[in-house]
Amino acid sequence: MPSFDIVSEVEMNEAKNAVDNANRELETRFDFRGVDASIELNDKVIKLKAEADSQVIQLFDILASKISKRGMDVSSLELQDISRAGKNVFRNVGLKQGIEKEMAKKIVKAIKDSKVKVQAAIQGEEVRVTGKKRDDLQEAMQVVRSADLGQPFQFKNFRD
C-alpha cells in the first residue's frame, strides 16, 4: 500500500549559509558602519544583536531575504520578543523543526475534510499518509500544500 510522510525540517546547512551571507552583507551595509551588530546561529536558534530596535528589525529583514534566496521558507522562522542587555538589543529567531501535535491534528483534519481516500496517522513529529493509489496520495499532497497552516512541510519516504 503506497504511503509517504509529511515532515517539517529545516536544512541546517542552508540556514548556516544564509546566516553567513547575511553577515557578509552586514559588513558592507553603510547604515551598519561602526555599529555593534551581528547574526549568529546556535543549534536551532538564530541570535540577532544590534544597538537599537530598528536595527534588529533590519537585521531580520536581511536574514529573511538571504533565507528565501537559499530556497528555504521564511515561515519556518519563529520570531521571539526583543530583549535588552546594556546598550545592546537582542532578538532570538527560532527554527521550526518537527510538527507539533496541534499542527499534526490540523493536517489530519484538512486531509479528512477534503474527502480524499487516504488515511492519515500522527507518528511523533511526522504524519504518515497511506492510500490505495498513488493518485490519491498526490491529491493529499496538494491538499496539504494548499492549506495555509503557517509552516512549511516536506514530503518524504514515498513508498509504492
From Swiss-Prot:
The keyword Signal does not apply. Keywords: Nucleotide-binding. Pfam families: DUF520 (PF04461). One of its GO terms (molecular function) is nucleotide binding. Nucleotide-binding protein. Belongs to the YajQ family. This is Nucleotide-binding protein PSHAa2277. The lineage of its organism: Bacteria, Pseudomonadati, Pseudomonadota, Gammaproteobacteria, Alteromonadales.
